[in-house]
Amino acid sequence: MIFDYFDGAFYLNLNSRTDRREQFEMRTKHFGFNIERFPAFQFNKEDVKCPWGDDRWYIKISCTQSHINMVKEAKNRGWKNCLIFEDDCVFTEDYLSNMEKCVGDLKNVEWDLFYMGGEPNDYCTPITENIYKTKGVYGTHAYAINHTFYDRILNVNSECGVIDTIYLSWYIDDKKYIIAKELLVLQDDESISDLWGQHKKSVEIYKNAYKKWMI
């Protein structure tokens, strides 16, 4: 199995979003995946002040803290790497075959983060036929983190920002980010996003970004 390369896997889910839990577990069951649920952390709104008046800021940095908590748990368990999913992740039908190719290539390169999809923000250059080097990606609904990057994220203050922009913020020479050539995952556009308070409609954004930046 492709997951044999990874020491563990979590999917992030708020206790209040039982709908997303059911949908995600139904999707993983379809592929025969066994992914551990990780309860999302939630700050109290009154404890978090956003300097530019974003009423949903406490939710966004709660997501950041949740990702930090997953990385901390992976390190505590002694995992050399960890798959991280968010509960609105949707696997493409050819996920298994394409992911297997990517994993085969990952074994032979140095990497810190591996994105299974998302919105690249700059040109991505090929490493192999299956994986590309990227400067960063918007979206953290499906990625893997290597032990080489654990301490980097564990030293971050969650109030610095949204998790995907934090990953983007490191200088290119200080990170080894890899992205799948093919979109392996999307997000459920029919599910209301807690971070944004609306249907995000990200599928077309991701597809268009891939067309633009994957050379």
Give the location of each predicted region.
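An acidic/histidine-cluster motif and surrounding catalytic segment
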Residues: M1-F85, C89-I215
